[in-house]
Protein backbone atom coordinates (compact mmCIF):
# COMPACT_ATOMS: atom_id res chain seq x y z
CA UNK A 1 0.00 0.00 0.00
CA UNK A 2 1.59 3.31 -1.05
CA UNK A 3 2.01 6.09 1.50
CA UNK A 4 -0.56 8.80 0.80
CA UNK A 5 1.39 11.56 2.56
CA UNK A 6 4.13 11.54 -0.10
CA UNK A 7 3.94 13.00 -3.58
CA UNK A 8 5.52 11.58 -6.76
CA UNK A 9 8.92 13.00 -5.72
CA UNK A 10 8.65 11.39 -2.25
CA UNK A 11 8.10 14.81 -0.65
CA UNK A 12 5.56 15.28 2.16
CA UNK A 13 2.08 16.47 1.28
CA UNK A 14 -1.27 16.75 2.99
CA UNK A 15 -3.76 14.30 1.52
CA UNK A 16 -6.57 15.93 -0.48
CA UNK A 17 -9.85 14.84 1.12
CA UNK A 18 -12.03 17.11 -1.03
CA UNK A 19 -13.70 14.26 -2.93
CA UNK A 20 -14.40 12.14 0.15
CA UNK A 21 -17.91 11.75 1.51
CA UNK A 22 -18.89 13.46 4.75
CA UNK A 23 -19.90 10.79 7.26
CA UNK A 24 -20.24 10.41 11.01
CA UNK A 25 -16.86 9.50 12.49
CA UNK A 26 -16.26 8.25 16.03
CA UNK A 27 -13.00 7.25 17.69
CA UNK A 28 -12.31 5.90 21.17
CA UNK A 29 -8.78 5.88 22.57
CA UNK A 30 -7.38 4.99 25.97
CA UNK A 31 -4.22 5.10 28.04
CA UNK A 32 -3.03 4.65 31.60
CA UNK A 33 -0.89 6.49 34.12
CA UNK A 34 0.58 4.57 37.05
CA UNK A 35 2.08 6.14 40.15
CA UNK A 36 3.03 5.48 43.74
CA UNK A 37 0.40 5.21 46.48
CA UNK A 38 1.17 8.67 47.87
CA UNK A 39 0.47 10.38 44.54
CA UNK A 40 -2.64 8.26 43.89
CA UNK A 41 -4.05 9.05 47.34
CA UNK A 42 -3.31 12.77 46.92
CA UNK A 43 -5.36 12.80 43.71
CA UNK A 44 -8.25 10.80 45.18
CA UNK A 45 -8.34 12.89 48.38
CA UNK A 46 -8.04 16.23 46.53
CA UNK A 47 -4.72 16.91 48.24
CA UNK A 48 -2.72 18.14 45.25
CA UNK A 49 -1.69 21.79 45.66
CA UNK A 50 -2.11 22.55 41.95
CA UNK A 51 -5.86 21.85 42.17
CA UNK A 52 -8.38 19.22 41.07
CA UNK A 53 -6.21 16.87 39.02
CA UNK A 54 -8.80 14.68 37.29
CA UNK A 55 -11.10 17.55 36.38
CA UNK A 56 -8.14 19.47 34.98
CA UNK A 57 -7.06 16.40 32.99
CA UNK A 58 -10.53 16.19 31.45
CA UNK A 59 -10.41 19.83 30.36
CA UNK A 60 -6.86 19.39 29.03
CA UNK A 61 -7.93 16.30 27.09
CA UNK A 62 -10.73 18.25 25.43
CA UNK A 63 -8.27 21.01 24.54
CA UNK A 64 -5.84 18.42 23.19
CA UNK A 65 -8.46 17.03 20.82
CA UNK A 66 -9.28 20.54 19.58
CA UNK A 67 -5.61 21.42 18.94
CA UNK A 68 -4.54 18.18 17.24
CA UNK A 69 -4.13 19.59 13.73
CA UNK A 70 -1.85 22.32 15.08
CA UNK A 71 0.65 19.73 16.36
CA UNK A 72 0.39 16.76 13.98
CA UNK A 73 1.69 18.06 10.62
CA UNK A 74 -0.49 16.04 8.22
CA UNK A 75 -3.64 16.05 10.35
CA UNK A 76 -6.55 18.00 8.84
CA UNK A 77 -8.30 20.62 10.98
CA UNK A 78 -11.85 19.39 11.48
CA UNK A 79 -14.88 20.54 13.41
CA UNK A 80 -15.53 18.28 16.39
CA UNK A 81 -19.10 17.51 17.41
CA UNK A 82 -18.10 16.28 20.85
CA UNK A 83 -15.33 15.05 23.12
CA UNK A 84 -16.21 12.86 26.11
CA UNK A 85 -13.56 11.83 28.60
CA UNK A 86 -13.86 9.24 31.36
CA UNK A 87 -11.20 8.50 33.94
CA UNK A 88 -11.36 5.20 35.79
CA UNK A 89 -9.67 4.82 39.17
CA UNK A 90 -7.62 1.63 39.50
CA UNK A 91 -6.93 1.53 43.23
CA UNK A 92 -5.10 -1.82 43.29
CA UNK A 93 -2.40 -0.60 40.89
CA UNK A 94 -2.42 3.10 41.87
CA UNK A 95 -3.37 3.92 38.29
CA UNK A 96 -5.89 5.90 36.32
CA UNK A 97 -7.15 4.80 32.91
CA UNK A 98 -8.32 7.63 30.69
CA UNK A 99 -10.75 7.10 27.80
CA UNK A 100 -11.49 9.74 25.17
CA UNK A 101 -14.38 9.46 22.72
CA UNK A 102 -14.38 11.97 19.88
CA UNK A 103 -17.20 12.46 17.39
CA UNK A 104 -17.57 14.45 14.18
CA UNK A 105 -19.28 14.54 10.81
CA UNK A 106 -16.43 15.08 8.39
CA UNK A 107 -14.45 13.79 5.42
CA UNK A 108 -11.70 12.36 7.62
CA UNK A 109 -11.57 10.46 10.88
CA UNK A 110 -10.93 11.57 14.45
CA UNK A 111 -8.50 8.85 15.54
CA UNK A 112 -5.66 11.33 16.01
CA UNK A 113 -7.90 13.66 18.01
CA UNK A 114 -8.86 10.82 20.37
CA UNK A 115 -5.23 9.73 20.77
CA UNK A 116 -4.10 13.32 21.36
CA UNK A 117 -6.88 13.81 23.89
CA UNK A 118 -5.73 10.79 25.90
CA UNK A 119 -2.07 11.79 25.69
CA UNK A 120 -2.64 15.38 26.82
CA UNK A 121 -4.98 14.31 29.62
CA UNK A 122 -2.41 11.84 30.96
CA UNK A 123 0.45 14.32 30.60
CA UNK A 124 -1.60 16.84 32.58
CA UNK A 125 -1.98 14.37 35.43
CA UNK A 126 1.79 13.83 35.34
CA UNK A 127 2.46 17.57 35.38
CA UNK A 128 0.17 18.22 38.32
CA UNK A 129 1.53 15.38 40.47
CA UNK A 130 5.22 15.24 39.52
CA UNK A 131 6.21 16.97 42.76
CA UNK A 132 4.95 13.88 44.62
CA UNK A 133 6.09 11.14 42.21
CA UNK A 134 8.54 11.70 39.37
CA UNK A 135 8.56 7.96 38.56
CA UNK A 136 5.00 7.89 37.15
CA UNK A 137 4.62 5.99 33.89
CA UNK A 138 2.26 6.59 31.01
CA UNK A 139 1.50 3.46 29.01
CA UNK A 140 -0.83 1.71 26.64
CA UNK A 141 -2.02 4.73 24.67
CA UNK A 142 -4.04 3.12 21.89
CA UNK A 143 -6.99 3.33 19.56
CA UNK A 144 -9.76 1.14 20.99
CA UNK A 145 -12.44 1.73 18.34
CA UNK A 146 -13.20 3.77 15.26
CA UNK A 147 -16.25 3.91 13.05
CA UNK A 148 -17.22 5.70 9.87
CA UNK A 149 -15.43 6.44 6.66
CA UNK A 150 -14.23 4.37 3.73
CA UNK A 151 -12.13 1.98 5.82
CA UNK A 152 -15.10 1.05 8.01
CA UNK A 153 -15.07 0.04 11.64
CA UNK A 154 -12.08 -0.99 13.74
CA UNK A 155 -12.05 -2.60 17.16
CA UNK A 156 -8.80 -3.30 19.00
CA UNK A 157 -8.17 -6.91 19.91
CA UNK A 158 -8.59 -7.54 23.61
Curated annotation (Swiss-Prot):
GO terms, biological process = Mo-molybdopterin cofactor biosynthetic process
**Could you tell me which InterPro entries the record lists for this protein?**
MoaC, MoaC_bact/euk, MoaC_sf, MoCo_biosynth_MoaA/MoaC, Mopterin_CF_biosynth-C_dom
Question: Carries keyword Lyase?
Answer: yes
What positions does UniProt annotate as the active site of this protein? 127
- Pfam families recorded for this chain? MoaC
Query: Where do the annotations place substrate binding?
Result: 74-76, 112-113
- Tell me, what is one Gene Ontology molecular-function annotation carried by this entry? cyclic pyranopterin monophosphate synthase activity
Q: Which reaction does it catalyse?
A: (8S)-3',8-cyclo-7,8-dihydroguanosine 5'-triphosphate = cyclic pyranopterin phosphate + diphosphate
The annotated pathway is: Cofactor biosynthesis; molybdopterin biosynthesis
Which superkingdom, per the lineage?
Bacteria
What is the purpose of this protein?
Answer: Catalyzes the conversion of (8S)-3',8-cyclo-7,8-dihydroguanosine 5'-triphosphate to cyclic pyranopterin monophosphate (cPMP).
Q: Which family does it belong to?
A: Belongs to the MoaC family.
Q: What is this protein called?
A: Cyclic pyranopterin monophosphate synthase
> Which species is this UniProt entry from?
Helicobacter pylori (strain HPAG1)
Q: Which gene encodes it?
A: moaC
